[in-house]
Amino acid sequence: RTAFSVSKSVPAKVAAIVIPVAASGPIPSGVGLNRAQLSTLGFEGRASQTQTLPPAAGKTAVRVLLGIGEVRNLDTSVLRNVAASAARACARYESIATTLPGVMRGSAKAPTQAVVEGIALALHRWVALKNDKSGLSKLTSVTLVSAEKTAEVQAGMLMGIATSTAVCTARDFANTPPSHLTARQFAEHAVAIAEASGLEATVYNKDQLIAMGCGGLVGVNAGSTEPPRMVKLEYKPASARGKVVLVGKGVMYDSGGISLKPSDGMHAMMKMDMSGAAAVLATMGALRALKVKTQVTAYLMCTDNMPSGSALKLGDVLTMRNGKTVEIHNTDAEGRLILADGLSLGAESKPDAMIDIATLTGACLGALGKKMAGVLSNNSGVVSQLMNSSSRTNELLWELPLFHDYRRLLDSNVADMRNIGGPYAGATTAALFLHEFVGTTPWAHLDIAGPMDADGDEGWLNRGATAYGTRLLIDFCANFTKPSKKK
């Protein structure tokens, strides 16, 4: 991991100095070239553009020019991606210094957090199972230089370290293959994180889940040789200003069950079907470090979805935690079954708001692509807060309709409902299914099936699991206010 520090001046011994350069306006004095000269090098100051120059006279540190675009267009989202480009350009150096946190007007706290996140997340790689680690970044030290706003930069740095560490933790879990991360092992990791983060942790085994009436989680697990686990985590700060419940889908590997998935590239990515639970666990682990004042309870619903002689079958009927019965029409619509039990348990505690996060539907991926997640909700106040968090974190959300006329698509002749609504409006019918288990609780469903992984390195994202939703949930909990019970 890269270490960050704050200084009022550039350290004497540093391998590279990252100099922010805007697309117009004055050139920083340390560059030593005018715009015409920079243009001959192909450097125009476009956002995320980089150009390496040799050390200035009498100096040893190389200079890395970093384009930040037009200053009027700068925000934390741009800054995060710009910092990520700087990190990749400087990955061969052991140490760098930069004044990047100070390029925006106003407080340097949020810009610094974005810079730290961009650098840390761009450099992160999951290589636990690789013998050849030669391609890893050599950058171990980053000095954030600020002569006047040292306290703000220090505060933003600490926040950025906490949030980026959480994201890296969630990425590592989601990138780990199912041969190395079962529901039981994930629960053990959750307990360890809880102990290190001041959380209360309770792990429920299969027998306990049966006794609790968690028919969704137990039913999905029926085809697996690995038993299920439900992990309850509780963060209880003094003088809490509200109570939030988070529920994460933790399907450690999703074969589709009897409704077997095709053997294509997407099937191979189904180790990431626990990305929701990974994001929730990582979020919980960051709350104390960030001194969040909201009380947060989390449920991690963990199991495989496998085919076997004992697996869930089409036509089977499950009884869920809240007593509702569900007829199975597709065993690959399993995520909603395990979330339903978690939502039922969460609603019983009467929280001020409840959020579930899941890689739930291909329909949402088809509608929104890989750059944003869908949000469906029964409460506009919760959506508004999530959208504000989305804007601050650049984890994009788009609200899809919870259109109640489509509830009839879930009707069953033999049970209260069935687990799939047909070929159309799949993201909406999945959310309508979940809505049956939240009661009157203000609730939102985050469908992260699209942005769960990245195809390549771009901005703060790296190829592989993205841990999408982690920073968003942290920000939501940190800034939470009680919404109205009305829609």
Each PLM stretch: what is its role?
Residues 1-250:
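Short amphipathic alpha-helical segment within the helicase RecA-like ATPase core
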Residues 48, 187-487:
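A generic structural signal for tightly packed, nonpolar segments enriched in small/aliphatic residues
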